[in-house]
C-alpha cells in the first residue's frame, strides 16, 4: 500500500508541471510575452518547457528522483519570487504559497526518495 501511495503522490505533485508545460506549448508567444513582462528573457521558455516535461516524468518513473526533486523545488521557489510577488492580490498570494508548498513537497521527496516502485530502486550497485 505504501508503494502505491508513494507512486500516486509522485503523479499528483508532477501533474501540475506537465499541465503547465502543455499550456505553455499551446500559447507559446503569449507565455513568452508574459514572461518578458517580468524581466525574464523569452528564450528561457523553451528550456522551461523542457524542464517541466522531463523532470516530472523522472519523478513519476522514479528515475533520479532526488535530483529532479531538488531542481523542481528550486524552480518552484524561483517562480514564486519572480512571478507571484504582488501581495496586494489575493490570487497572487495563493499562487506564491502554492509554489512554496510544492517546493516543500519536492524537498520532502528529495530527502526521503521514492519507495520501491521506482527505477532508482531497481538499480543494482556493485562496490569494488
Which residues fall in each region the model found?
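Extended, low-polarity transmembrane helix blocks
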Residues: 1-26, 33, 42-50, 54, ...
Amino acid at each position: 500500500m505504501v508503494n502505491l501511495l508513494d507512486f500516486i503522490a509522485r503523479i499528483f505533485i508532477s501533474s501540475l508541471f506537465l499541465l503547465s508545460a502543455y499550456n505553455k506549448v499551446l500559447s507559446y508567444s503569449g507565455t513568452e510575452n508574459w514572461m518578458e513582462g517580468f524581466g525574464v528573457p523569452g528564450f528561457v521558455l523553451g528550456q522551461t518547457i523542457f524542464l517541466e516535461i522531463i523532470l516530472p516524468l523522472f519523478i513519476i518513473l522514479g528515475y533520479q528522483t532526488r535530483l529532479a526533486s531538488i531542481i523542481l523545488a528550486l524552480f518552484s521557489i524561483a517562480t514564486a519570487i519572480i512571478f507571484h510577488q504582488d501581495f496586494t492580490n489575493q490570487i497572487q498570494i495563493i499562487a506564491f504559497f502554492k509554489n512554496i508548498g510544492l517546493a516543500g513537497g519536492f524537498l520532502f521527496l528529495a530527502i526521503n526518495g521514492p519507495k520501491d516502485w521506482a527505477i532508482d530502486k531497481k538499480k543494482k550497485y556493485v562496490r569494488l
